[in-house]
Regions:
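Early transmembrane hairpin of solute transport permeases
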Residues: 2-162
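Hydrophobic alpha-helical transmembrane segments
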Residues: 12, 134-141, 175, 179, ...
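Hydrophobic alpha-helical membrane-insertion segments
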Residues: 15-32, 88-102, 177-187, 221-243
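Membrane-interface interhelical connector segments
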Residues: 37-45, 238-278
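Juxtamembrane/interfacial segments around transmembrane helices
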Residues: 66, 74, 113-127, 189-198, ...
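Membrane-interface helix-loop-helix junctions at boundaries between adjacent transmembrane segments
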Residues: 114-117, 124-136, 148-149, 153-211
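Aromatic-rich transmembrane-lumenal/periplasmic boundary elements in polytopic membrane proteins
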Residues: 186, 193-252
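Conserved small/polar residues in nucleotide/adenosyl-binding loops
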Residues: 282
């Protein structure tokens, strides 16, 4: 059991390998487009700002598509066979799941108590994933769907079909089964996840109101889990997902830099979530 959990924690770290370079690009792009730091050269409309904005937008690729990356990357560490094909199956199944959720909400959002007309990325819990308006489940939704697909892949990938159905074997058969499974999961998610989002908002406030005590508990638990290789399970939702702040703490840092640089107010007021940042945690 412990080995399985450790493998899961290690698989979670796979997308994190991309964060170092992406973080450097975002950091430099944000720095060089902040007028209060760079001066008039970084004013809006200058060639300097336009060029660095292009680079900055490219740098956000990893952080803006985190759920998709986690959905695709998890099979690399957990699929027992043909991991590459499992990644493809997870990718398509995850998109299928989100299309199901989007279609259900388009038809029954008022009855489900969801404001599906809200802008993506707001507190209303709506997100856009690969161009699909859906519920904002962050990496939790990606891990759920990817985990289901991995289980189906390990179980059905080698299923023997009659010769005349051979075209449906392998990855095609896994996707067929996944397609069927995604629909009831989508139904359950649209019923349950809005209530989970309410609980997450309460949890965010509790952690922020706890101040140094909350930070101390977080850091203590993280350090305790490091010898077991399970610390990724604790910090990933805080740093890369919406548990504390929309988009994750690291993405929030980059977004907040221009405002922080231009303000004279204490950091504790401008970014109370910043106290949970621990750069050593990503090692």
């Amino acid at each position: 059991m412990m080995k399985a959990i450790q493998r899961f924690g290690g698989a979670l770290f796979t997308p994190a390998m991309l964060f170092a370079f992406a973080g450097v690009v975002v950091g430099l792009g944000t720095l060089f487009t902040t007028e209060s730091i760079m001066g008039p050269i970084a004013a809006a409309g200058t060639t300097w700002t336009k060029c660095w904005t292009v680079i900055l937008d490219g740098g956000w690729t990893v952080f803006n598509q985190l759920p998709l990356l986690f959905a695709v990357a998890l099979p690399i560490g957990l699929a027992k066979k043909q991991a590459g094909r499992c990644c493809l199956e997870a990718f398509v199944a995850y998109l299928t799941f989100n299309y199901f959720v989007s279609s259900i909400l388009s038809a029954w959002a008022p009855e489900l108590g969801v404001d599906f007309s809200a802008s993506a990325g707001t507190a209303e819990g709506i997100a856009t994933i690969a161009g699909i308006r859906t519920l904002d489940m962050g990496i939790a939704g990606a891990l759920l769907i990817s985990g289901v697909v991995i289980a189906l892949h390990n179980r059905f990938f080698d299923t023997r079909l009659p010769e005349w159905l051979g075209v449906f074997s392998g990855s095609t058969f896994v996707y067929m089964v996944s397609f069927i499974v995604m629909l009831p999961i989508a139904v359950v998610v649209v019923l349950v996840w809005p209530k989970v989002q309410v609980g997450m908002h309460v949890f965010q406030q509790v952690i922020l109101d706890a101040g140094t005590a909350g930070v101390g508990i977080f850091v203590f638990l993280e350090r305790v889990l490091i010898p077991f290789g399970l610390h990724h399970l604790l910090y990933a939702p805080f740093y890369y997902d919406n548990v504390i702040v929309q988009g994750g703490i690291y993405a929030a840092w980059a977004n907040a830099l221009p405002g922080l640089a231009a303000s004279t107010r204490p950091l504790a007021e401008l970014a109370p979530w910043a106290s949970l940042t621990d750069r050593k945690s990503v090692v």
